[in-house]
Amino acid sequence: TSRRQRQMCIRDRHGIRDVNGDPLNWEACITMNNNWGYCARDKFFKPSSMIIKKLVECVSKGGNMLLNVGPDAYGNIPPESLQILSEIGAWMKKNSKSVYGCGMAGIEKPDYGRVTRNGNLLYYHMFENTMGPVPLTGIKPGTIKKIRLLCDGSEVPISDSWVHTDYPDIVFANLGPDPVLPDAVDTVLEVELTE
């Protein structure tokens, strides 16, 4: 609240902005466990799935993520950290295109995950599966050139099921009958727009 106008409350729901209302660069700094640097007693490491989802969240909000890795006095990185970094690296090997060079998509966050964007490419990050076809909210029908799974490049068809006729303004991607996502941490759909 303001000192002069106690009834006034200032909120930052629209992100961090400068005096002109333009978004500012920002960064989230996180640790792999609960301490900065090395702490032999701290064995409470964050799972790689949590770190991947936080990375995607930062990018989808227009930010950067710094990940702290604390080597010991001899320069050795703890085995727990190496395992987590290896798992993050395996996910990035398949999905880095949805992170590097991307930023906010200007689309409301879907219930199942996040959305990042790079030019005419939208990346729908699915942290959990939907019941049936995936609603690609924020995209106008007729503006999609192609949808594919980023992890393997396989094309994903647009659903034309009769159950979607009540939602003419939403495009639905059909991942098929298997309710299990290809990647339990974050399955990424790359949506190429015509413009």
Question: Which residues are covered by each model-predicted region?
Answer:
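Single conserved hydrophobic/aromatic residue that forms the stacking wall/gate
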Residues: T1-I10
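Carbohydrate-binding surfaces of carbohydrate-active enzymes
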Residues: R11-E195
